[in-house]
Amino acid sequence: MMTDELDTLLEWFDLKDELRTGWVLRNIDSPESVAAHTWGTASLCLLYAEQEEIDRQKAVTMALIHDLGEARTGDIATRAEEGRQTTPTSEKEAAERSAVTDLVGPFNDTELLALWEEYEARDTPTAQFVKDMDLIDNCLQALKYERQTRYDEAEANDHFAEFENLDEFFATAAPRLRTAFGQNLFEQIKSQYERELGRPCQL
């Protein structure tokens, strides 16, 4: 193993320590890392890809690298309210593309870079499926945190002034889902979230 490969591997592993910004802003106790989210997304692909006639290996591989760039850029959260988006989408995409290119470079694996580009374009059924599983993972995590009472509901939080509880994570996901399967999963998770809260989720 060359030195640049070792150094790059260690940078990949930074995802294990990079906390998911949305949960941090919501003051979730011990929030998940980007790597934990990646595992959740890959697991959903593993379980459901073939059911949706998607190549399982390709989907899982795409899921494993979909947030790789955040090892260098950090996790830039997508917000439901446009005015709360701190970094323009184009700037975020450019930074992540540069990071992924650098992080894959030492391994000379053009297939991984191509899969990441395919994911970002969202033009193929596989990319749309994986993106939906990325969003579904977030909704599942919101339901899990709500059940575990991992935040102080009564605490004033300027970052989430427009939404109660963890509604914003559902509101962020809802308009971005592209597949019927993803939308169906979303409705099931949201319905359970609503039953447990005893009120409709604000979207």
What do the predicted segments below correspond to?
Residues 1-203:
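Alpha-helical, largely C-terminal catalytic domains
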